[in-house]
C-alpha cells in the first residue's frame, strides 16, 4: 500500500539515520496512514487512505 494520504497528499519524508559514530544510512519516515470508510458525496461510502492528522482535523466524514 502506498504511504500517501488521499486527502492532503502527505507522503513519506526522507533523510539519514545517523549512528553514534556518525555513519549515515538512508531511511524514510512514513506518515501514519489509516484505511477508513469515508462518506463521499450523498450517502456514498468509499475506503480511502487517510493520515491521522487529517482524521484529527475532521477533514473526513466517517
Swiss-Prot record:
Q: Which GO terms describe its cellular component?
A: ribonucleoprotein complex; ribosome
Sorted keywords for this record are: Ribonucleoprotein, Ribosomal protein
Is Transmembrane helix given among the entry's keywords?
no
One of the GO BP terms on file: translation
Q: Does the keyword Ribosomal protein apply?
A: yes
* InterPro entries xref list: Bacterial_rp_bL28 (IPR050096), Ribosomal_bL28 (IPR026569), Ribosomal_bL28/bL31-like_sf (IPR034704), Ribosomal_bL28_bact-type (IPR001383), Ribosomal_bL28_sf (IPR037147)
Q: Name one GO molecular function term.
A: structural constituent of ribosome
Under which name does UniProt file this protein?
Large ribosomal subunit protein bL28
By sequence similarity, the record places it as follows: Belongs to the bacterial ribosomal protein bL28 family.
Q: What Pfam families does this protein's entry cite?
A: Ribosomal_L28 (PF00830)
Q: Which domain of life is it from?
A: Bacteria
Against SUPFAM superfamilies, the record matches this protein to: L28p-like
Q: Which Gene3D superfamilies match?
A: Ribosomal protein L28/L24 (2.30.170.40)
The organism's lineage is: Bacteria, Bacillati, Actinomycetota, Actinomycetes, Acidothermales
